[in-house]
From Swiss-Prot:
InterPro entries with a match to the protein in the record: Ubiquitin-like_Pup
Signal peptide from the UniProt entry: none
GO biological process: modification-dependent protein catabolic process; proteasomal protein catabolic process; protein pupylation
Protein name as it appears in the record: Prokaryotic ubiquitin-like protein Pup
Complex formation: Strongly interacts with the proteasome-associated ATPase ARC through a hydrophobic interface; the interacting region of Pup lies in its C-terminal half. There is one Pup binding site per ARC hexamer ring.
This protein's domain notes: The N-terminal unstructured half of Pup provides a signal required to initiate unfolding and degradation by the proteasome but is not needed for pupylation, while the C-terminal helical half of Pup interacts with ARC to target proteins to the proteasome.
UniProt cross-link Isoglutamyl lysine isopeptide (Glu-Lys) (interchain with K-? in acceptor proteins), position: 64
GO molecular function, one term: protein tag activity
Segments for region (ARC ATPase binding): 20-58
Keyword RNA-binding in record: no
UniProt entry keywords in alphabetical sequence: Isopeptide bond, Ubl conjugation pathway
Length: 64
């Protein structure tokens, strides 16, 4: 009977740990998405100002 209790406690701990890991992973995903959105907003702003300079700079950097 004591083995059943230990096993049940380990399962509960494992489930709690998994939930914490998933929560942490989800927060990292939200952070990554936010960073990507910021980068895309910056690119949109540059393209709105002067698309030709942006493309020229991008092509030169990519070609080196």
């Amino acid at each position: 009977m004591s083995r059943e209790r230990i096993s049940a406690q380990q399962t509960e701990t494992t489930a709690a740990e998994q939930e914490q890991e998933l929560t942490l992973a989800a927060s990292h995903v939200v952070s990554d998405v936010s960073e990507v959105d910021d980068l895309l907003d910056e690119i949109d702003g540059l393209l709105a100002e002067n698309a030709e300079d942006f493309v020229t700079g991008f092509v030169q950097k990519g070609g080196e």
